[in-house]
A protein has these predicted regions:
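Residue-level detector of alpha-helical secondary structure
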Residues: 25-29, 49, 75
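Ligand-binding beta-strand-loop-alpha-helix segment within the catalytic cores
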Residues: 51-89
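Short, active-site-adjacent cap segments at secondary-structure transitions
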Residues: 14-16, 44-48
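General beta-strand structural signal in soluble alpha/beta enzymes
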Residues: 8, 38-42, 82-89
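N-terminal glycine-/serine-/threonine-rich phosphate-binding loop
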Residues: 1-38
Length: 89
């Protein structure tokens, strides 16, 4: 068992700027890291859609932003099927 856990965020800007190939490359780099690694997905284009809706109350926007992270996590799991998609660690 690893002595530590490394937490890495892969943000949605990577998808916007480099597409799926950039996400795959980032996942490859993360997979090469030593020890236990947890990837936290950003919201990506899904969070952008939440931001585009003007006037949402903060609690609603927050809930939607968390859902956006789940959706982007599903994209990461598609791009790198060797990653295990989990809801909690």
């Amino acid at each position: 068992m690893a002595k530590y856990t490394l937490v890495v965020k892969i943000g949605g800007g990577l998808l916007r700027e480099g597409g799926l190939a950039a996400l795959r490359a980032a996942c490859d780099e993360v997979a090469a890291l030593p020890g236990r690694v947890v990837v936290v997905p950003g919201g990506g284009p899904f969070a952008d859609a939440v931001r585009a809706v003007d006037g949402l109350p903060n609690p609603v926007a927050h809930r939607l932003a968390l859902a956006a992270m789940d959706q982007f996590g599903a994209v990461l799991a598609h791009v790198a099927p060797e990653l295990e998609l989990v809801g909690a660690v």
